[in-house]
Amino acid sequence: MREGGHYPGQCRKKAGLKALDPDTGAADAAHIRAKEIVQSFSHTRPDGRTCFTAASDLGVSYRTAGENIAYGYQTPEQVVQGWMNSEGHRKNILSSSFTKIGVGCYEKGGVLYWSQFFIG
């Protein structure tokens, strides 16, 4: 899902920010979260813990983190455009606090579930 990290980079470049570096740990957390939001479309995990425990459970260290979630979009470009049209999601994409990104996508019943996981 590398292209999922490409489109936020374009948005950041337009805003005069450095692109986010792809991160394997953040991507692994994003993949876990994309599967989980099928059960519970929330930043709280199905077990009741915060979404950020998906990264810490994997041993990913970070000082700051953020998450964007979505479903129903068919392409990385469409989902990023949807996030950019939402103030809270746009803040995550354009935050100078984040330096790395991981993107996850999971398909269930013909519907795509998306997660962006940001760390800094």
Model-derived segments and spans:
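Disulfide-stabilized extracellular recognition modules
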Residues: 71-120
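A short alpha-helix/helix-coil micro-patch that ends at or immediately precedes a cysteine
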Residues: 1-39
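Residue-level preference for nonpolar/small residues embedded in alpha-helices
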Residues: 3-4, 47, 85
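Short, surface-exposed glycine/acidic/tryptophan-bearing loops
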Residues: 27-74
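Hydrophobic side chains within well-formed alpha-helices
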Residues: 22, 26, 51, 65, ...
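Extracytoplasmic/cell-surface-exposed regions of Actinobacterial cell-envelope-associated
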Residues: 14, 35-39, 52, 89, ...
